[in-house]
Amino acid sequence: MNILVTGGAGYIGSHTCVELLNSGYDVTVIDNLCNANPKSLKRVEAITGRKVKFYEGDVRDEALLRKIFAENEISAVIHFAGLKAVGESVAQPWRYYDNNLNTTLVLTKVMTDVGCKKIIFSSSATVYSGDNEMPLRETSRTGSCTNPYGWTKYMTEQILSGIAFADKEWSVVLLRYFNPIGAHESGMIGEDPRGIPNNLMPYLTQVAIGRREKLSVYGNDYPTPDGTGVRDYIHVVDLAKGHVAAVKYVVSGLGCEVFNLGTGIGYSVLDMVHAFEKANGVKVPYQIVGRRPGDLPTCYADPAKSERVLGWKAEKNLEDMCRDSWNWQSKNPMGYGE
């Protein structure tokens, strides 16, 4: 069975390619490399001993998509391709709406035309409204997003669920991720953000390796045990395995289903700093700065539905996440730039 992975050279995409290949699937990737490095796919091949068929290009390129579907017998699509920086989306809303919505529209048009109607979408916990009680369930309120990135994920969910409602041949799975961190235990692939990292863990590892002076902790006056923001951090390998479980589900089902992929456990920023220091025997200097607008005090998942329906559960703990993140960064101080 051949799975098309859009954005497959990226952080979560590359880890998912490893798990798909290890589970016996063939993998075809399209990626425009705007936020990824092609070395990641070479390393995926080295880890698995299997080949990835790679097309460099944009998912909005309809002719290229038609070529990919003509040359490969694609059974299902995992759709990662998209811009993903919250702050950047506020500064460049048009670019985010154009990229993140039109990739989905062009992709589903071609999929409909060729009769491949099975898609897994990489959504996000950002689709949930800020006024929900914790933990977040798939039935918690969505919408009223605080930034264009969140809105693009919300709108894409609406597009895909609408398609599945109108055409009963479609099978759609929407995976709402919480906060992926960590790296493959080999240290060969990991998170390699362009420029200043937007997420906690890559910033933390870059401080630890000496690329940045200190970590900025945004706010210590939240209504949380230590005053810093609490999030549901999930190991990227667990997340990738969730996609393999979703593939098994999507090829046998119809309609549209939503699943949270998280651990159900919330850790604060300072919890993360201290756990990282302890797991790796390094010091991470940090400073407390003002809150970031739009940040919630607490956000964590109820992942019970994923376990019940997909048979998937996160297995790796906080120490694993911290150790594997540092293993990747210390072996690759400049990321894929080495």
PLM features per residue range, with description:
Residues 182-184, 221-222:
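Short, basic/glycine-rich phosphate-binding loops at helix/coil junctions
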Residues 1-183:
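N-terminal Rossmann-like NAD(P)+-binding domain of SDR-like oxidoreductases, especially those catalyzing
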Residues 57, 69, 96, 144, ...:
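Pocket-edge positions in alpha/beta enzyme catalytic cores
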Residues 97, 146-154, 190, 194-198, ...:
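Short-chain dehydrogenase/reductase
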Residues 200-338:
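C-terminal substrate-binding subdomain of Rossmann-fold SDR/epimerase-dehydratase oxidoreductases
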Residues 2-4, 94-95, 147, 191, ...:
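Short, contiguous strand/loop micro-motifs
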Residues 184-197, 204-207, 213:
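Hydrophobic, Gly/Ser/Ala-rich alpha-helical and linker tracts in large acyl-processing enzymes
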